[in-house]
Amino acid sequence: MREQSGRSLIEIIGVLAIGAIMVSGTYAIYNTTNQKQKRLIASETLKDIATKTKTLLEYSGYQNVSIDFLIESGAINSNKSPAGNQDWSITSNVDGTEFSINLNGLSFDECAYFTTKKMDWTTHISVNGFDSSATSYCLKTGDNKISFYAK
């Protein structure tokens, strides 16, 4: 009988399979951590925008609030959206006593995160035009719109 030297094909496939599992697990952990970090940064950015808007316009009313106004006043650095696509806005209600930060193009997961996270700076949240804090109005197809209202 001949003696074997080296590894068998089964052993090599087993080692490669273990390596593939480790790589895919690492990728999944990275993705989860990355998404969580992006959402935390977006949350803090929204809070910062709301705080600076209140500081600038609380006593004079929010009628003229806009992204361009906040950039010109130095409250925010750019018109880059904190989350979702780049189609976002800051608007006031009719009498100027309240303003909203409107984010468009949010995925279902982002929508669910922002509607379930407690944000003490908001008076209420609107999801796809419905006033609610429940995720039941988040569309699974994506392209969700959330408005955060503050006074």
Where are these regions (language model features)?
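Charged, low-complexity, helix/coiled-coil-prone segments
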Residues: 10-19, 53-65
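A generic structural signal for solvent-exposed, polar alpha-helical segments
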Residues: 33-36, 94
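N-terminal alpha-helical signal peptides/signal-anchor transmembrane segments
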Residues: 29-33, 43-63
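Periplasmic/extracellular, small/polar-rich flexible segments of pilin-like filament-forming proteins
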Residues: 58-151
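N-terminal single-pass transmembrane signal-anchor helix
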Residues: 1-34, 42
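Generic detector of well-ordered secondary structure
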Residues: 24, 32, 51, 113-116
